[in-house]
Amino acid sequence: MLKSNLKIENRLSLIGVTESVKRSKSPNGIEHCRIWLEHRSEQQEAGLIRQARCKMPIQISGHQLIHKTQGITVGSKILVVGFITSHKQTNGLNQLVLHAEHIELLD
């Protein structure tokens, strides 16, 4: 627990533009949406401005969040808040994935 009494163990918020959107349904009927999000911003560090860029896969699962993805297409600007975890890829490498718990379409 932090001194501020906030419980923030694994939380990430990211704004970016969608590069790809793929919807699917698991064999047990759970709907999923996988988005590649590209983030670009300027951040101040040690008194200097630096370019911050990343591409991150976003995993959206379950009916409550899936309906919020209906308006999201390639090029949409969105805010995603959730937790990060590592997924093992088919090539054996691990990749960080942001699992969405909140999504907002910004444009």
Swiss-Prot record:
Domain SSB: 8-107
GO biological process: DNA replication, synthesis of primer
Keywords, in A-Z order: DNA replication, DNA-binding, Primosome
Any one GO molecular function term: single-stranded DNA binding
Bilayer-spanning residue ranges: none
InterPro entries assigned to the protein according to its UniProt record, in alphabetical order: NA-bd_OB-fold, Primosome_PriB/ssb, Prisomal_replication_PriB
Gene3D superfamilies per the UniProt record, alphabetical: Nucleic acid-binding proteins
Gene Ontology CC terms: primosome complex
Domain of life: Bacteria
Family: Belongs to the PriB family.
Subunit organization: Homodimer. Interacts with PriA and DnaT. Component of the replication restart primosome. Primosome assembly occurs via a 'hand-off' mechanism. PriA binds to replication forks, subsequently PriB then DnaT bind; DnaT then displaces ssDNA to generate the helicase loading substrate.
Function: Involved in the restart of stalled replication forks, which reloads the replicative helicase on sites other than the origin of replication; the PriA-PriB pathway is the major replication restart pathway. During primosome assembly it facilitates complex formation between PriA and DnaT on DNA; stabilizes PriA on DNA. Stimulates the DNA unwinding activity of PriA helicase.
Name of this chain's protein: Replication restart protein PriB
Organism field: Actinobacillus succinogenes (strain ATCC 55618 / DSM 22257 / CCUG 43843 / 130Z)
Gene behind this protein: priB
